[in-house]
Swiss-Prot record:
Expressed in liver and testis. Up-regulated in regenerating liver after partial hepatectomy. One of its GO terms (biological process) is tissue regeneration. The gene is Tm4sf4. Regulates the adhesive and proliferative status of intestinal epithelial cells. Can mediate density-dependent cell proliferation. Coiled coil: none annotated. Residues 1-9, 70-93, 180-202 are cytoplasmic. PANTHER family: TRANSMEMBRANE 4 L6 FAMILY MEMBER 1-RELATED, TRANSMEMBRANE 4 L6 FAMILY MEMBER 4. Disulfide bonds: none annotated. This is Transmembrane 4 L6 family member 4. The chain crosses the membrane at residues 10-30, 49-69, 94-114, 159-179. It comes from Rattus norvegicus (Rat). One of its GO terms (cellular component) is membrane. It is a multi-pass membrane protein.
Length: 202
């Protein structure tokens, strides 16, 4: 597959992943599917906006760049037929790095939150974090330590797990584009388009 075509495929995959990440992060503001009375009762990691910023906003820009690569004109520099395409592929590599860092941020925030557990109203009538070092992951009986919001443990665990998986997939896809972009920069795309007037190799 041409490097431009590969990038377009990656971009088309990143867009829905970014949308799902944003939606998952938004749902975290409604623990157990309910509106909280006090925002301070939400887990700290929810406010880090891992899904909205990391896997969402910072992923949209690279995805759009990747999608536009296949149609990019390859006649851009002083009459050199491959220069424009190579520069576009190099630029996509930089955007892929940005996307990778955003996905990594979301991945780390999600992993920390899963290990830490949700903030909830505990049996001692205070709000806090009753779990330690992910102990609740292997012992569902510990979930009873959280009295309110109802079902906050499975809610947070499910949504942060989704963000963890999405972040991991996005990191892999962006890493692939870094390699793909470098190959496109060094070797050129498999064909020349636009003002170059034909399907000549570069």
């Amino acid at each position: 597959m041409c490097t431009g075509g590969c990038a377009r495929c990656l971009g088309g995959t990143l867009i829905p992943l970014a949308v799902f990440a944003v939606l998952a992060n938004i749902l975290l503001f409604f623990p157990g599917g309910k509106v909280v009375d006090d925002n301070s009762h939400l887990s700290d990691e929810v406010w880090y906006f891992g899904g909205i910023l990391g896997s969402g906003v910072l992923m949209i820009f690279p995805a759009l760049v990747f999608l536009g690569l296949q149609n990019n004109d390859c006649c851009g520099c002083c009459g050199n037929e491959s220069c424009g395409k190579r520069f576009a592929m190099f630029t996509s590599t930089l955007f892929a790095v940005v996307g990778f860092l955003g996905a990594a941020y979301s991945f780390i925030v999600s992993a920390v939150s899963i290990n830490k557990g949700p903030k909830c109203f505990m049996t001692n009538n205070t709000w806090g974090y009753p779990f330690h070092d992910g102990d609740y992951l292997n012992d569902q009986a510990l979930w009873s330590k959280c009295e309110e919001p109802r079902d906050v443990v499975p809610w947070n665990l499910t949504l942060f797990s989704i963000l963890l998986v999405i972040g991991g997939i996005q990191m892999v896809l962006c890493a692939i584009q870094v390699i793909n972009g470098l190959l496109g920069t060094l070797c050129g795309d498999c064909q020349c388009c636009g003002c170059c007037g034909g399907d000549r190799p570069v």
